[in-house]
């Protein structure tokens, strides 16, 4: 098998203290979007590290412990479904990454952002890198943190709403999830501005004004 980790650069640039930033849960129908930022020590290397979407759940959990133990600094932020509905998912992702980066101590001097767009009020230079979580270790580490923290949250949520199958789908738009929405309606954790329908049939939903 190809060792993806051997192809990851530690970071995008080496002149400034860099934090990798990524998010998880952007395409989900329910739950927050989670964002993470992390500063890795020089020459950090772990043979398991790669884009979190390419890793097994077991390896992601192993790496989370390594990253949280060895990182110079790391932070994870969650942006709620209500906030996503208010400002849209793209801006919510930007907000989450900005909040996570702002919590880092020591503060980053440069941000390496996974993706092709970013906006922030932070006065920190940044670079957007398409598929950066498969190129740079600090972005991949942020990807792992965001994914594992979100999965952990969604598993707790699944205990509250077992009928939606979130232990399996974790809020993603699977057929099972859409069918459950059609049968049971929406919960306060669903994103009201997303398309939940499996077809053109109407289904009951909670009034947006009733969201706590």
Segments (PLM) and residue ranges:
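RNase H-like, Mg2+-dependent phosphodiesterase core
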Residues: 2-212
């Amino acid at each position: 098998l190809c060792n993806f980790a051997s192809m990851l650069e530690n970071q995008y640039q080496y002149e400034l203290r860099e934090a990798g930033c990524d998010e998880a849960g952007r395409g989900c129908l329910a739950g927050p979007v989670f964002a993470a930022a992390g500063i890795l020590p020089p020459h950090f290397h772990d043979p398991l590290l790669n884009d979190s979407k390419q890793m097994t759940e077991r390896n992601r959990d192993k790496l989370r412990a390594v990253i949280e133990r060895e990182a110079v600094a790391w932070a994870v932020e969650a942006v709620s479904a209500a906030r996503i509905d208010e400002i849209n998912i793209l801006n919510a992702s930007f907000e989450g990454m900005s909040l996570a980066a702002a919590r880092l101590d020591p503060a980053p001097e440069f941000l390496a952002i996974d993706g092709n767009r970013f906006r922030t009020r932070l006065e920190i230079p940044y670079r957007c890198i398409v598929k950066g979580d498969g190129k740079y270790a600090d972005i991949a580490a942020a990807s792992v943190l965001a994914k594992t923290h979100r999965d952990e949250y969604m598993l707790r949520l699944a205990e509250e709403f077992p009928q939606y199958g979130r232990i399996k789908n974790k809020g993603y738009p699977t057929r099972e999830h859409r069918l459950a929405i059609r049968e049971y309606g929406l919960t306060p954790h669903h994103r009201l501005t997303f398309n939940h329908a499996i077809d053109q049939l109407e289904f009951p939903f909670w009034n947006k004004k009733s969201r706590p």
